[in-house]
Regions:
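Extracellular/periplasmic helix-loop-helix junction of adjacent transmembrane segments
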Residues: 27-54
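C-terminal ends and interior cores of transmembrane alpha-helices
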Residues: 81-99
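Substrate-agnostic recognition of the 12-TM MFS/MFS-like secondary transporter fold
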Residues: 12-28, 51-64, 73-85, 105-164
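Helix-to-coil boundary motifs at intracellular loop junctions of multi-pass secondary transporters
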Residues: 34-38, 68-69, 127-132
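Primarily residues marking transmembrane-helix entry/exit sites
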Residues: 6-14, 42, 99-107
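A helix-boundary/kink motif common to multi-pass secondary transporters
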Residues: 40-41, 70-74, 102, 133, ...
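Alpha-helical transmembrane segments of multi-pass secondary-active solute transporters
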Residues: 45-48, 75, 140, 170-172
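Transmembrane alpha-helix termini and helix-breaking/packing motifs in multi-pass membrane transporters
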Residues: 32-38, 91-97, 154-173
């Protein structure tokens, strides 16, 4: 925790990943709920639930690409901006009339965004290692992992609550 308070590079990287985790957690739970409202909902919910598997299966390849990237900071910024643009497109598209075809487009956007997120996370790990002294690295990584896990759990619950509170108004997300 001390590293978070005194090291601006570490704090920036952690905050960036936490914001990414918040967005992903909110979106993932809302997307499964959205899938349950389209035609052929059993298949849609199954596909939405399984969509997280594709980026996980590709994570080794994505990690290698991230390791080989020469301008990690530039790629990380580009990755996060690309994710933001994808989510803006998604916010527009999700407001259109529901159909299974539209759901598949949204699913593809979700998978691409998750792959980009994995790439961005892979880029940030070496930056994290360079921004924290070796003696503080274990505690910094512990806080990093614990924070991300906690944020994901909390915001999945918040996402489910908010979507009900917003009367299933998906474009608000």
């Amino acid at each position: 925790m001390n590293e978070y308070l005194k090291n601006i590079k570490y704090r920036t990287l952690l905050n960036s990943d936490l914001i990414d985790s918040i967005g992903n957690s909110l979106y993932d739970i809302v997307f499964v709920i959205y899938a349950s409202t389209v035609s052929n909902k059993s298949l849609a919910v199954s596909l939405a639930s399984m969509a997280t598997i594709v980026p996980a299966l590709l994570s080794v390849i994505i990690g290698v690409w991230a390791d080989r990237a020469s301008k990690k900071v530039n790629y990380m910024i580009l990755t996060r901006l690309s994710q933001a643009l994808l989510f803006m497109a998604l916010a527009f598209l999700i407001g259109l009339n529901k159909s299974f075809g539209l759901f598949l487009v949204l699913l593809l956007i979700n998978i691409i965004s998750d792959i980009l997120g994995n790439f961005g996370n892979g880029l940030s790990l070496p930056l994290l290692q360079h921004s924290v002294a070796e003696k503080d690295l274990n505690s910094a990584m512990g806080l990093y992992t614990a924070s991300n896990t906690t944020i994901q759990l909390i915001f999945q619950a918040i996402g489910a609550t908010l979507i009900v509170g917003f009367n299933y108004n998906y474009p608000l997300f």
